[in-house]
């Protein structure tokens, strides 16, 4: 398994708490894949831990462990037992407790990734839980998805439009999706991605480093 090289990390000053990055989006959009790719792309420079949310299982925790995203002890699965939106917004106590437990184990952590359970376009993270929010949608959901709006589309710090390779198969026009995204988000950034091929992952990492004040 891979251990983070904390001695040479480009990291926040330890006077600041670790950066908390929330990853949300509908079921099947690619949240877990994004989290896997971020962990693999950042673990050599930063001390990372990850928390996943599922309603009745710890499936995403299992998938990340099998994929070798991080050592098993650095990934915690949370069973919300109900609406995934509630667990990251209205009553985020179960996730706040998970963050506290992980930081007790790994007090030098630079970044805590928190993946929500699959939810609708209205899902948002509590500011108590997340410093940066990344919302993932996918092209297979239809060209119209950006136009539907909702806080995930319009208010997230970064919007990831995944599975661009499927556009020809589902009749989606990526130029239209990009145009609609700009109309809905204004100056807020977005990234077109094919996460399975690592296309766009570097842009997401650069965003986290810049907005999270991780670069020196």
Curated annotation (Swiss-Prot):
Keywords: Chaperone, Cytoplasm, GTP-binding, Nickel insertion, Nucleotide-binding. It is found in: Cytoplasm. The keyword Transcription regulation does not apply. GO terms for cellular component: cytoplasm. GO terms for biological process: urea catabolic process. Pfam families: cobW (PF02492). The keyword Ribosomal protein does not apply. GTP binds at residues 25-32. It comes from the Bacteria. Its main location: cytoplasm. GO terms for molecular function: GTP binding; GTPase activity; nickel cation binding. InterPro entries: CobW/HypB/UreG_nucleotide-bd, P-loop_NTPase, UreG. Homodimer. UreD, UreF and UreG form a complex that acts as a GTP-hydrolysis-dependent molecular chaperone, activating the urease apoprotein by helping to assemble the nickel containing metallocenter of UreC. The UreE protein probably delivers the nickel. Facilitates the functional incorporation of the urease nickel metallocenter. This process requires GTP hydrolysis, probably effectuated by UreG. Belongs to the SIMIBI class G3E GTPase family. UreG subfamily. This is Urease accessory protein UreG.
């Amino acid at each position: 398994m891979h251990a983070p090289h904390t001695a040479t990390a480009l990291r926040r000053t330890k006077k600041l708490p670790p950066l908390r990055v929330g990853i949300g989006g509908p079921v099947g959009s690619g949240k877990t894949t994004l989290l896997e790719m971020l962990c693999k792309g950042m673990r050599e420079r930063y001390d990372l831990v990850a928390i996943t949310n599922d309603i009745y299982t710890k499936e995403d925790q299992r998938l990340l462990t099998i994929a070798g995203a991080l050592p098993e002890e650095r990934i915690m699965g949370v069973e919300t037992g109900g609406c995934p939106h509630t667990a990251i917004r209205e009553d985020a106590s179960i996730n706040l407790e998970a963050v506290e437990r992980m930081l007790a184990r790994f007090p030098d952590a630079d970044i805590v990734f928190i993946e929500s359970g699959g939810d609708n376009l209205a899902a948002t993270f509590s500011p108590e839980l997340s410093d940066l929010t990344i919302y993932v949608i996918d092209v297979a959901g239809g060209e119209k998805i950006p136009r539907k709006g909702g806080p995930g589309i319009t208010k997230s710090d970064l919007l990831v439009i995944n599975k661009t390779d499927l556009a020809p198969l589902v009749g989606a026009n990526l130029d239209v999706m990009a145009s609609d995204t700009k109309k809905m988000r204004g100056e807020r950034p977005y990234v077109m991605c094919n996460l399975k091929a690592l296309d766009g992952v570097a842009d997401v990492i650069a965003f986290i480093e810049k907005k999270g004040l991780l670069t020196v």
